[in-house]
């Protein structure tokens, strides 16, 4: 009977664990939906800003203008920004970013460049600090739906380093959100800036629904926002280089914000997938344990019957 009690306790523990993972899955699903909506809401502004910068750059080709954030100088020092989460329970999300950062760090060092790290998220900070990597700055406690203020504080750090020529290039490593089951670590150059458009056409969007009590995902496509071209006859009161130097920091902040938003959506999607797998595994394990319990109980009952029958035969 002790064996039966152990199995019952395991079944109870597995079912309680499944309740927790299912709740975490639903919370992550709700948050990843909000993260996606934030990206879509910010896209029209990003599109218009990118087109304006392209227009200004085109005019500056014929003028002797100075834009420090566009300066492509000889490469000696590179700053790598790695974006991870503050928490775990999200599958391989954090490990994949850390692995890609190490690979890029070694690639740059093998070419003779000095490399510094700017780390976002406790997982990256803990890993690289324990291994004595050169860390320039760290950021923690960012919201799961990143804000412009948070992106501004991160952008200002690398902005100052680039303008002071402490670093010659800034790259950001984050997880690009493709869809709910697919995320990819990518490396993008932040500085020097190269505004060439930042919105992807026909991004996948999704709707969370329920069917037979289970969470379901319906996917679809969101067409890119059609923005009218800027007229070449627009007259600016300020010179193009003044406007460009005023808008480029805003563009940099927007790029950082979009990267943080992509990373946040990827983390939440990874957590939702991990918790979904954990819930499915818990359900399967509970089913297996229930079968084991029934077999053990049946065997115990059979044994008792045999003992009673044997005792009766002995008495008779």
From Swiss-Prot:
This protein's GO CC annotations: plasma membrane-derived thylakoid membrane; proton-transporting ATP synthase complex
Keyword hit for rRNA processing: no
Chief localization: membrane
Entry keyword Isomerase: no
InterPro entries: ATP_synth_F1_ATPase_gsu (IPR035968), ATP_synth_F1_gsu (IPR000131), ATP_synth_F1_gsu_CS (IPR023632)
Highest taxon in the source lineage: Bacteria
Membrane topology: Peripheral membrane protein
Localization (cell): Cellular thylakoid membrane
Keywords tagged on the record: ATP synthesis, CF(1), Hydrogen ion transport, Ion transport, Membrane, Thylakoid, Transport
A molecular-function term among this protein's GO annotations: proton-transporting ATP synthase activity, rotational mechanism
Assigned protein family: Belongs to the ATPase gamma chain family.
Subunit description: F-type ATPases have 2 components, CF(1) - the catalytic core - and CF(0) - the membrane proton channel. CF(1) has five subunits: alpha(3), beta(3), gamma(1), delta(1), epsilon(1). CF(0) has three main subunits: a, b and c.
PANTHER family (alphabetical): ATP SYNTHASE GAMMA CHAIN, ATP SYNTHASE GAMMA CHAIN, CHLOROPLASTIC
Function per UniProt: Produces ATP from ADP in the presence of a proton gradient across the membrane. The gamma chain is believed to be important in regulating ATPase activity and the flow of protons through the CF(0) complex.
Protein name (record): ATP synthase gamma chain
Organism: Synechococcus sp. (strain WH7803)
Taxonomy of the source species: Bacteria, Bacillati, Cyanobacteriota, Cyanophyceae, Synechococcales
Gene, per the UniProt record: atpG
